[in-house]
Amino acid sequence: NDRPKIIVFESVYSLDGDTSPIAGIAALARRYSALTYLGEVHAVGMYGAEGGGIAQMRGLDDGIDIIQGTLGKAFGASGGYIAASDVICDTVRSNGSGFIFTTALPPAVAAAAHVAVRHLRHDGTLRTAQQRQASRLKDCARAAGIPILEGDTHIVPVMVGDAAATMRICQLLLDDHGIYVQPINYPTVPR
């Protein structure tokens, strides 16, 4: 039918590090004349030849209607963005109440984000180092018998299985080693 349709999905899922089947979802969207809205917030700056994310890495970014990213995480600033056609961006700019009634990024934050995006776009050494460190962490966890969910992204879920123990481990890592780890417990994830 002619009803507007949109498929919203993420490229990298933050809790388990899985990646989505972007090509298949884009094909499904084309089949049903739906827009695609891809969240690349866990991937921009870290994947793709220019840090554009998983879709760029797979050569699929031109087939996505709307790509959402963040200026936090890899870029180390604050704020977010969408990359889309002029028509879609103008529509959001003119009709999106969340956009209309929000405060613009402070100039210093915008400048920092601009420099970070430009740097990561043209210099892949940090992306390579980040992937190497994630791989090293996975190898060390396996060698130590620490249960992790296997995946091919930088996200390394450690499966503790007990909420209280998870909190104690995270606090110990922070107190003794200065390492902050975000604990994720039930009900955010299954028991």
Indicate residue ranges for each PLM-predicted region.
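Active-site phosphate-binding strand-loop segment of PLP-dependent enzymes
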Residues: N1-L38
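Short, small-residue-enriched loops and turns at beta-alpha junctions
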Residues: S11-D16, A43-Y47, F99-I100, P157, ...
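Conserved PLP-binding catalytic core of the aspartate aminotransferase-like
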Residues: S20, R127-L137, R142-G178
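Active-site PLP attachment segment
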Residues: E50, Q56-T91
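A short glycine-threonine-serine/GTX helix/turn-capping micro-motif
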Residues: G96-L105
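Structural motif of enzymes handling amino- and sulfur-group chemistry
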Residues: A104-D123, A129, Q133, R142-A143, ...
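Conserved PLP cofactor-binding pocket of PLP-dependent enzymes
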Residues: D176-R191
